[in-house]
Amino acid sequence: MKRIVLLRLGHRPERDKRITTHVGLTARLLGAEGMLLASNDPGIIATLEDVVSRWGGNFYIKNNVNYKQEIKEWKAAGGKVCHLSMYGINLPDVTDELKSCDKLMIVVGAEKVPPEIYQLADWNVAVGSQPHSEVAAVAITLDRIADGEPLKREFQNAELTIVPAERGKQVIENLRD
């Protein structure tokens, strides 16, 4: 089973909470096992943990991590690092390599990322080579890597499950032990 984790850099609690939450929600939905937040924001952690509690799955969130240490440990354990931005190799040109990784850390920034990230990453990947949202970059990249498979999975231990319907909203409240 492929392991994917997202590392969020440069999160500014007062400015970026909504976007960082959406980055985490997107990563969870599209197959990442967890998110590492290289800032201190317990509110983000609480929000994402609440979603996991209600909607299921095993997504984890670590707060206030040392990004250099996390990257070092990930690579020492055989993982690869992909930094998403608007600079670098075009995503379509590197998708097959990313798909072949068993252990992939995806790095996205909020504010300007430290220049050393470009050196620490195995790939610096451009998603469109134009200004864009990090939420979009994560979504497009994870979808390309997984060929849409995460969109078909069921989240285990969910309190709530949406029933797909052409019209209307149907949510099932699941009984849990």
Curated annotation (Swiss-Prot):
Sequence positions that bind S-adenosyl-L-methionine: 84, 109-113
The entry's keywords: Cytoplasm, Methyltransferase, S-adenosyl-L-methionine, Transferase, tRNA processing
Main location: cytoplasm
Annotated GO MF terms: tRNA (cytidine(56)-2'-O)-methyltransferase activity
Reaction it catalyzes: cytidine(56) in tRNA + S-adenosyl-L-methionine = 2'-O-methylcytidine(56) in tRNA + S-adenosyl-L-homocysteine + H(+)
One Gene Ontology CC term in the entry: cytoplasm
Location relative to the cell: Cytoplasm
Subunit structure: Homodimer.
PANTHER family (alphabetical): TRNA (CYTIDINE(56)-2'-O)-METHYLTRANSFERASE (PTHR42197:SF1)
Family, as annotated: Belongs to the aTrm56 family.
Name of the protein in its database record: tRNA (cytidine(56)-2'-O)-methyltransferase
UniProt organism field: Methanosarcina barkeri (strain Fusaro / DSM 804)
Lineage: Archaea, Methanobacteriati, Methanobacteriota, Stenosarchaea group, Methanomicrobia
